Amino acid sequence: MTKPRIVAIDDEVEFIDVLENYFGLRGYGINVAVRGAKGIEIVKEKMPDVVLMDLKMPGIDGDEVLKLFKSMTPSPKVIFITAYDDGGKTKARLLKMGAYACLDKPVSSLKELEETVNKAASN
């Protein structure tokens, strides 16, 4: 089975390093960005299967980026990973808008994240 292609966008460099190492060592094609605008460029260029993205980053609106990614053909599956908590309202809205999943940060299990990525890519 071919591993999904991933783009990870997060302004926390340490978290990006963890994702890049974890998925890279397991044979996934992964590109990373610590700035939202650069991440959008990479997604447009690489056309990944899955985008892992923080919701709250300087100069970037998760809702708008999700709309942009959903308008692409083929459209990548977007998995938000965020520490932002407003009682689940934002997560519910993003899921309704077409996000594949909204996960809590810190990520409790990279293995579970990997399973979510694989499920997203196979849908």
Task: Tell where the protein language model's regions lie, with residue ranges.
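Short amphipathic alpha-helix used as the core "switch/output" element in two-component signaling
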Residues: 41, 63-74
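Helix N-cap/capping motif at the beta->alpha junctions
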Residues: 32-41, 62
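Alpha4 helix (beta4-alpha4-beta5 surface) of REC/receiver domains from two-component response regulators
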Residues: 64, 85-107, 111-115
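Two-component/phosphorelay signaling modules centered on CheY-like receiver
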Residues: 13-31
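Hydrophobic/aromatic residues positioned on beta-strands within the core alpha/beta folds
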Residues: 81-82
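Active-site beta3 strand of CheY-like receiver
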Residues: 46-52
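Active-site T/S-Asp motif of two-component receiver
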Residues: 8, 53-54
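Receiver (REC) domain active-site loop signature in two-component systems and cognate sites
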Residues: 57
